[in-house]
Structures are given as structure tokens and as C-alpha cells.
């Protein structure tokens, strides 16, 4: 599926769940630093997404944290029970295969494309921070989509993923 088709497929799934979203288009961005000037006016929790694999390339994780978090992969590996030093960034080819999105577009909204190979790790601050909206890329890094934390969790569970919720404070 091409980018526009993926975006339409996402919108169809969200619509089927009666999930209301707010979308802001902006220039393509590849880092949180590039993104923030375009969306800092949006109130809520903004995301940073890491697509990771274990050393043996048998397991994949999509890790979604607040945009300003610094993540220690060794600490995260211990929390996930995979052993320090065993987590690394997956390449774009793996992300395209598993989530159908490329570099700069990692998003938990792409979990509907996964056939069950990707484990989803979510920063507890998205659910416990009292945020009116949480923001992610909608299958493209040229837009940002906001939805309520409750609707986001409903969507993630509809994809067949039970999030691993971790506290990153």
C-alpha cells in the first residue's frame, strides 16, 4: 500500500471505531526537533517513537515515549527482560516490512499493519498525565494526528496489541 492508501486505511479503521481526530499538516520532519516548531501550539502529549529489535533479530518493539524523553536502550532492555546490550535500532527495511512506514514515520498508529510480530511499549505518561489529546504521525511524517488517550488505547487494542506500559520517569 502506498502512503495515501495507508492513510485512508487508518482513517477507515478510526472511523469504524467512532474515533474523532485532529490532524495538522506540516512539512516532512524526520526528528522530534524538526517537528516541534510546527506542533508546539497543540496542547497534549507529543510522541517520540523508536523501532527496535533484539540482537538476534527475532523480536521487534515499537517504543512510544513523550517527545522529550531520553531513552537508555540498556535500561529499557533490562525492563523488557531481554538483557542489557541486546536492544538496537531496527533498519528501515524491517520497519517497512512490519509497519509499512519508513524512516521518520514510526508511529503506533501503524500497528494495524503488523501481523503480530511487533511488541508495543507505551510510556505510562500518555495515559496517566491527564492529557486531553495524544499526538502521533498518521502514517506520514508530513502530518500529526491528535486523539484522546482513551480512543488511542481502544485503537491499539483493536490492532491486537496489548501495550506494555512502562514508567520512564
UniProtKB/Swiss-Prot annotation:
Gene3D superfamilies: YbaK/aminoacyl-tRNA synthetase-associated domain (3.90.960.10). InterPro entries: ProX/PRXD1, YbaK/aa-tRNA-synt-asso_dom_sf, YbaK/aa-tRNA-synth-assoc-dom. GO terms for molecular function: aminoacyl-tRNA deacylase activity. Belongs to the PRORSD1 family. This is Putative prolyl-tRNA synthetase associated domain-containing protein 1. It comes from Homo sapiens (Human). The lineage of its organism: Eukaryota, Metazoa, Chordata, Craniata, Vertebrata.
